[in-house]
């Protein structure tokens, strides 16, 4: 099948509490929706995000064919670089976090890269998590996103301290696309290990207090944010609608290692 049916994936049809706790998830429960089939029966199928984004089964022939067909179609219609959205969730194994499961994730990535290369395209895995994952990808010569830059740069501007930002510029991948804001907002999880926890908290508090048009309520469980994983605002808002601060941030981004990507809504 194309999707991951719980009755086939889990030994008892549903995960134990320990297995549920181990899963890297965006909701405070096991990640699934109840799907109704043509014969009126209902089953739990894996769903990491919203109901319109049911996870694909990368282990079955149907899943593999779907992946290949779409990669080839995109490349043949002009895509030279194909983003693999939320790629770290693609491989699942019972008893693991089901997030960036090694070595399986590398096998899937290599399969995607091979298909894309046959059509003259490259792939760009999109992963929000610890910066070490981006470094692992870069070591294998894959393009990556720099999702650590936004919060590091905010911290530097807020507190006039470039120490952590400069350190990141020294160790960050070079084959990367830099961002300040995206449709997901500003990443928080991406700077763990690059900013001390207390500095992350200070930057978040400063953003909520001084950032224009930023509300805490949009970054809570009520709005499907289990943790403050990403802060939903533009970079301009995060800088308090300060034109000079925004231009400074963009200038630093444009001269930082990598290719700058500018989110059009953030302009």
PLM segments and residue spans:
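Active-site and adjacent substrate-binding regions of carbohydrate-active enzymes
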Residues: 1-267
């Amino acid at each position: 099948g194309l999707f991951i049916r719980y009755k086939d994936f889990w030994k008892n049809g549903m995960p134990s509490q320990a297995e549920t706790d181990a899963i890297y998830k965006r909701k405070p429960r096991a990640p699934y929706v109840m799907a109704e089939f043509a014969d009126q029966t209902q089953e739990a199928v894996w769903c990491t995000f919203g109901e319109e984004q049911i996870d694909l089964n990368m282990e079955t022939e149907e899943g593999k064919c779907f992946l290949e067909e779409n990669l080839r179609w995109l490349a043949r219609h002009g895509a030279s670089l194909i983003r693999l959205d939320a790629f770290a969730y693609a491989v699942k194994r019972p008893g693991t976090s089901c997030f960036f499961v090694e070595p399986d994730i590398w096998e899937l990535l290599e399969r995607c890269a091979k298909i894309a290369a046959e059509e003259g395209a490259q792939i760009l895995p999109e992963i929000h998590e610890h910066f070490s994952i981006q470094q692992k990808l870069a070591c294998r010569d894959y393009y990556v996103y720099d999702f650590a830059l936004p919060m590091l740069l905010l911290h530097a501007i807020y507190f006039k301290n470039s120490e952590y930002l400069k350190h990141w510029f020294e160790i960050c991948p070079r084959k990367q696309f830099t961002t300040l804001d995206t449709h997901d907002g500003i990443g928080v999880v991406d700077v763990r290990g690059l900013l001390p926890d207390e500095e992350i908290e200070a930057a978040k508090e400063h953003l909520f207090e001084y950032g224009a048009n930023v509300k805490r309520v949009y970054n809570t469980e009520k709005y499907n944010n289990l943790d403050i994983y990403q802060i939903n605002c533009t970079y301009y808002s995060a800088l308090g609608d300060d034109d000079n601060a925004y231009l400074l941030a963009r200038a630093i981004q444009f001269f930082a290692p990598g290719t700058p990507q500018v989110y059009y809504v953030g302009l």
